[in-house]
Amino acid sequence: MASKSGSLYAIPMDLGGFEFTTFAKTSIDSEVTGTQKYKSSWDFLLLLSIYKIVFNELQITEIDEVNEVVFMLDKMGFSLDSGFKADVTKLSKLKIGTSIVQFDAEFEKEFNLQPRTYLERISILNEKMLKVLCDVELNDRQISLIIDGFDDILRYKKNKMDIVASLIRSADYINNALMMKKKKIKILLLVREDLIAMVVDPDLNKIIHDGAISLSWSNRLDDLKELVNLRFKLSGVREKDLNACWKNMFPNKIKNKNSWEYALDHTLYKPRDILQFLNYCKEEYPQKEKLTISEMQNVLKAYSNRYFIEEMKNELSGFIDDDLIVSIPSIFRRLGGRAFSLSEINKLSNEQCTKKNITIDDTKMLLMYLFEAGYIGQLVSSGKDVKRSVIFKYRNPTARIDYYQQFITHQGLHRGLGVRLLK
């Protein structure tokens, strides 16, 4: 669904449920790896998506060049009314040659050329589509194509990094081409940092370094509170009552902290976390206007069990063996909220996963992803001082893991695991 604000058209494109197995058939050559393997296929899908926005959302239907491209695509079998999944299926059929006759007939008519390969077909078509976009007049309107839902690719074992790398390369290529022509069209990719870290390509490193923005709320907690207030406003709370809304809903103090800080301690400082907590408040106590301390803690237990623990498992999917992921809640439950070492969690992992041997390297990888995602913290001692501090990545984005230190689980996991909360 498009979101329009003034002259800006923000269009979400969710890759959740994307047919990666089908898309994998569209590689230009089985011998090619890295960013070029799927770039041409991504170029086509992204350009086709932009044409759908230009034609269907902005309703630019009176420019001959645009109409010619739209008509040509329709004749080739790619309708602007079709969904993303259908486009991927048609593209894969084109690659393997099952729908090539109709496409080639229109291609020869348009370009006066008989194509020999999939790459030739799609590259020439992409060039035509991009050239027309670079010349179209948007009348000060802006388009943002926002691509999210990359998590599903982690479940796809083969070529997943080539697919991600090619998408990043494609978005960068199209963005640069449109920017050079001063067109206010931008493709935005919302990608987890741990997924980006898996892409090993020197050229992509420069693209990511120059064009990536890291989203962190660790130093923007006031903005996070404003976002929550916006949610209250959308729920019907009057503007003048927004600042007092949280205080009116929750206890003033819990364990020497105000209730806002107490709730944040059970999150990773992500908007989604705190909004999910509010959803569970409504779900658990739909008739209550203000929760007691006991009721708020009951909500945190439901939030931890049904959301926070599941989010942790989802974040590990595709990086860590599935059997080990399933065992993690049991491993953490046995730890009981206390500090643990690399060797101890390796021992517990092998006790829980009896069907396979979990090596120290496997355990290091598990700890690294848990630490990077914020679900475990590092206990650090300074000199001879007995008092230790806890470092979490989501609070300190520059933190680096040290496997020789002890670790501790995030407080947001404890209630769902049924372990004693640390004081």
Regions found by a protein language model. Give the residues of each.
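C-terminal leucine-rich, beta-strand-based interaction scaffolds used for sensing/assembly
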Residues: 15, 181, 250, 254-423
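Amphipathic alpha-helical surface "interface" segments used
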Residues: 62-85, 244-258, 388-393
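P-loop NTPase nucleotide-binding core
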Residues: 2-143, 153, 158, 358-361, ...
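The catalytic "switch" region of P-loop NTPases
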Residues: 123-256
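Short, hydrophobic, well-ordered secondary-structure elements
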Residues: 43-48, 144, 165-168, 188-191, ...
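Short beta-alpha junction loops
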Residues: 16-19, 191-195, 382
